[in-house]
Design a protein with these regions (language model features):
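A conserved active-site-flanking secondary-structure segment within enzyme catalytic domains
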Residues: 44-80
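Flexible gly/pro-rich beta->alpha loop and the following alpha-helix that scaffold active-site loops
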Residues: 1-34, 46
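Glycine-rich nucleophile elbow surrounding the catalytic serine of serine-hydrolase chemistry
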Residues: 36, 40-44
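Catalytic beta-strand/loop cores that center a nucleophilic Ser/Cys/Thr
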Residues: 68-115
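Histidine-centered divalent metal-coordination motifs
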Residues: 36, 85, 124
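Structural signature of beta-strand start/N-cap positions in the alpha/beta core
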Residues: 2, 31-33, 80, 98, ...
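Acyltransferase
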Residues: 128-145
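Phosphate-binding/catalytic loops
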Residues: 78, 120-131
Length: 145
């Protein structure tokens, strides 16, 4: 089984429903993909800072660069990704998390837990305008624990 924590308006501290509790409970045992607010919840749960993004990105496409690890395995860097957010997880990341994707301006677009299958992306792989979105989701669904 897998868990996907999808986007929503608001902040991980106040408007995430059960998302933070789900991450805390399952991150060691079940692969989790956090999208947008889901990534922000991951950053928050592991002690990171979620702050206003330098630019509002509502329905805008921008290049995302990545490390080629995890859900980004086999994908070109950069690729175009659709973004709908006004908040981001800010660097430096907590020690448990590593940066996996970023913008040219240095905004965190992807992160993952160093030990457990807990992965976040700030952009929307499910959007029609995101290149390789299906590949990202396929990589998540086929990755081992």
């Amino acid at each position: 089984s897998r868990i996907i924590i999808s986007p929503g308006p608001g902040t991980p501290e106040q408007d995430s429903g059960v998302s933070n509790d789900v991450i805390r409970h399952f991150y060691k045992t079940t692969p989790i993909l956090g999208v947008c607010l889901g990534q922000q919840c991951m950053g928050h749960v592991f002690g990171g800072t979620v702050t206003r993004a330098p630019r509002l990105m509502h329905g805008k496409v921008s290049p995302v660069y990545h490390t080629g690890k995890g859900v980004f395995y086999g994908l070109p860097s950069p690729f175009q990704a659709t973004r709908y957010h006004s908040l981001i997880v800010q660097e430096p990341l907590p020690p448990e998390l590593e940066l996996t994707a970023f913008t040219m301006e240095g905004e965190v677009m992807g992160l993952r837990h160093r030990e457990y299958p807990c992965i976040g992306v700030q952009f929307h792989p499910e959007s029609i305008l995101t290149e390789h979105g299906k590949d990202i989701l396929r990589n998540f669904l086929t990755m081992s624990r």
